[in-house]
Amino acid sequence: MIFIPIIILIYLVSIAASDKSPKIKKNPRNVVAVADFPFGGDTQVKGNVVFSAKEGKHVNVHIDMTGLPKDEGPFFYHIHERSVPGNGNCEAVGLHFNPYNASPVCDEQKNDAYCQVGDLSGKHGCINTTCFELKYSDPYLSLNRKSKSYIIGKSVVFHYPNLTKIACADIEEANELRLQSLIDEYTQTDDAIQLKELNTPLETDYKFDEVEALSSEIYHSDTDSDPPQQELISTEKLYNKTDNVYSPEETRPSDQNKKSHRHSLLPLAKWKKNSPKNYSNISIHGISSDCLNDGMMVTGSVFGSLVLGIAAGIFV
């Protein structure tokens, strides 16, 4: 059959064609973004994803979710390129946020710089429980609206392994009322880390220079043995030329041609990175021991996963 060699060829080409994202060294300290669930899709999925950078450096991500379907994981989650329409249709959010045209096969890349900016589960691990809380920093996300990696106005989407969307929500800048409600949540749960992240006062004269910060978006060397490199990228290349607004559904491009995400069915073990994570059973919105995933099945063969992933990803 010709089909399988073609699959292998597409897989290899996608890996070779990966483009590299810069690390974001400066972010506004006075911006907090949040995706609140439920919004679109399954209304039983509740919680939030909070993005902040109170130190002015990398974006810190705090995920606290509950209500994902039992016995259906592992679950994948990504930032998608468009916001959720008013009718809550998760199919209208477009493809993964991928401003540097990276390969969808994050697991096979040299490092996370070659992954899609929005592929959060590819960079940080998929979820294998129905309720979870975790914290990590992602140096490839930006809260600077001039950056190509700017995430506000886009959406967070949770997927089944076959890429069917479960739930989605807009990433919005938190106003003072929403920020205070987050602080109240973390106060009730004694989450000192998040309280420090959100409740640290700024200097009265604090200002963030959006254009100047672009000069701090740099490529790093791929190997630890190489001397440090700080290759500055031209402002023109980094400047975010999209409007990042919630455009009416009828003005959005068609989403009929969906990209294949072949990594979605790779074995769960392949996704467990060595980087530390703050997985725990306690969640603000639930306790994961009350809703464990029993008997979760994951494809065990990379080649089998590749065939299934292409069949599920290209033609769905």
UniProtKB/Swiss-Prot annotation:
Protein function: Superoxide dismutases serve to convert damaging superoxide radicals, a key form of ROS, to less damaging hydrogen peroxide that can be converted into water by catalase action. May be involved protection against extracellular stress.
GO molecular function per UniProt: copper ion binding; superoxide dismutase activity
Official protein name in the record: Cell surface superoxide dismutase [Cu-Zn] 6
Catalytic activity annotation: 2 superoxide + 2 H(+) = H2O2 + O2
Induction field: Unlike SOD4 and SOD5, SOD6 is not regulated during yeast to hyphae transition or by temperature. Up-regulated during biofilm formation and expression is controlled by HAP43.
PTM characteristics: The GPI-anchor is attached to the protein in the endoplasmic reticulum and serves to target the protein to the cell surface. There, the glucosamine-inositol phospholipid moiety is cleaved off and the GPI-modified mannoprotein is covalently attached via its lipidless GPI glycan remnant to the 1,6-beta-glucan of the outer cell wall layer.
Family: Belongs to the Cu-Zn superoxide dismutase family.
SUPFAM superfamilies listed in its UniProt record: Cu,Zn superoxide dismutase-like (SSF49329)
Keywords: Antioxidant, Cell wall, Copper, Glycoprotein, GPI-anchor, Lipoprotein, Membrane, Metal-binding, Oxidoreductase, Secreted, Signal, Virulence, Zinc
